[in-house]
């Protein structure tokens, strides 16, 4: 097979792959990133970041995260959005205007669930 023919075949394959769409996106109504998946009591839970258009800098269309949602499923096809479980205004030590809540996680220990996450702290008083 000639190099030109190989290149043509690879080009067609690359075009086909790039045009493929997800057939069952888990989250299709909001921008999300950095998910953690955990199984609790036979049900899978997703804890993603929730990316919004910044109310402070609207031209910045990424990395503006003010809250967390949690999603769950028992069959990996049908997902429930349990809504906002925590917002930056509820974090006493967090900067309510930082929009930097990302990469959360949740664990269970002795029947209690612990949700943890990074957030920008309030500015120190000088």
Functional labels for PLM-detected ranges:
Residues 1-23:
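Bacterial Sec-dependent N-terminal signal peptides
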